[in-house]
């Protein structure tokens, strides 16, 4: 939530919009029962419950990567959203995706998030963002496996329950699809084209100078596009 509480949030508020950023169960400062499986159903149910308890109206759900899938599943469960913003979310369920996802969990099991980030960054980030990250990366002393019952590991393990065979054509709300071209892991252009073209009401934004983490790489530009999307829906 750090980026949202910084430049992104400030820009949204300047334009008259509000925002709510929250941590999933298992993420920093978010309590959880370590006997629970932090699977897709639980994370989506938490999102729905949060929106209902806070009585949020006139909302746009925004999700990065699998977060976009969770947001879409919340809409499928009946959450009233004016629109969806999917950031490097669209992908097909196949052997390649399952291999990547399971390998990421295994890497985190043995080397923690530090090794996982060092392994992924060159193939998900833009060269300029990679340079910014380099000073705090590539330090083997940071490679410490995650405890089985730690929040982050349980979240990663739970993410393997996600069903990527969702019928995207059933989405009835306007969708903004953001894609970073330096994402060499999840960006399969033909698949994104096919899925996007199946949607009833979709806009697309291509970030040729970004990778997977668009909100971190270009926070102001990202917020400007969110404001524009929200304005067009009002």
Give the label of every model feature segment.
Residues 1-32:
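Conserved HGGG/HGGXW glycine-rich cap/lid loop of the alpha/beta-hydrolase fold
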Residues 20-62, 224:
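Active-site loop/oxyanion-hole signature of alpha/beta-hydrolase fold enzymes
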Residues 72-76, 80-111:
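Flexible "cap/lid" loop of the alpha/beta hydrolase fold
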Residues 95-97, 113-169:
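Conserved alpha/beta-hydrolase catalytic His-Asp/Glu region
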Residues 171, 177-179:
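Short beta-strand/loop motif that positions the catalytic acidic residue
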Residues 173, 187-195:
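Short alpha-helix in the alpha/beta-hydrolase fold that links the catalytic acid
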Residues 210-223:
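Catalytic histidine-centered segment of alpha/beta-hydrolase-like enzymes
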């Amino acid at each position: 939530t750090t980026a949202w509480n910084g430049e992104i949030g400030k820009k949204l508020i300047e334009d008259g919009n509000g925002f709510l950023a929250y941590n999933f169960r298992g993420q920093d400062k978010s309590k959880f029962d370590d006997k629970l499986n932090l699977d897709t159903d639980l994370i989506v149910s938490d999102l729905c419950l949060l929106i209902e308890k806070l009585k949020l109206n006139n909302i746009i759900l925004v999700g990065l990567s699998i977060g976009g899938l969770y947001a879409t599943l919340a809409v499928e469960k009946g959450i009233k959203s004016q629109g969806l913003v999917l950031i490097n979310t669209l992908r097909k369920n196949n052997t390649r995706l399952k291999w990547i996802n399971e390998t990421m969990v295994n890497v985190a099991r043995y080397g923690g998030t530090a090794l996982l980030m060092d392994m992924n960054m060159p193939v998900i980030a833009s060269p300029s963002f990679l340079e910014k990250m380099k000073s705090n990366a590539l330090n083997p002393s940071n490679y410490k496996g995650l405890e089985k019952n730690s929040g982050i590991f349980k979240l990663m393990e739970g993410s393997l329950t996600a069903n990527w065979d969702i019928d995207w054509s059933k989405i009835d709300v306007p969708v903004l699809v953001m894609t970073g071209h330096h994402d060499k892991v999840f960006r399969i252009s033909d698949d994104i084209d096919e899925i996007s073209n199946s949607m009833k009401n979709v806009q697309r934004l291509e970030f040729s100078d970004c990778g997977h983490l668009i909100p971190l790489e270009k926070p102001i530009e990202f917020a400007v596009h969110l404001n524009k999307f929200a304005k067009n829906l009002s």
